[in-house]
Amino acid sequence: MGRILSAFLMLGISSMCGAQIYKYLGIEDGLSNRRIYRIQKDGRGYMWFLTQEGMDRYDGKRIRHYTVLDGNLKVAPQVNLNWLYTDTENTLWVVGRKGRIFHYDTLHDRFRMVYRIPGLQDDFATGMLCYAYMDRGDRIWLCQGDHIIRYDTR
């Protein structure tokens, strides 16, 4: 009787354990570059990839590439886009080492620059951010040299 009960118990447990399904995504699937710096999932279920070529969004079927602009100029992702966050309202934020903050505008389906550290130049001699962090209050903390700047996203 104990063996039969054990067999049914093991059968029930094994049927609850499902196999994980993995899918490889590469350049042949539309990924803009194999070098990926950050990955973030947004509130709508999209997977965002910060690559050496910019931002890619995966909807489960297709990958769409986004160019991030500062005005009319393309932002070089490999040196200017470094951190990727989602806030409590599921807005996607991208922060770059040169002190720029971008958010994904769902209405216009593009990234828009919303903040730039005043006085921080585009050349490497003037310094860069060493870290950026988004806290639970949706504030982005920008750390550079001997000072910290807080940007409130609301």
What is each of the regions a protein language model found here?
Residues M1-R154:
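Carboxylate-rich, polar loop motifs that coordinate divalent cations or form catalytic acidic clusters
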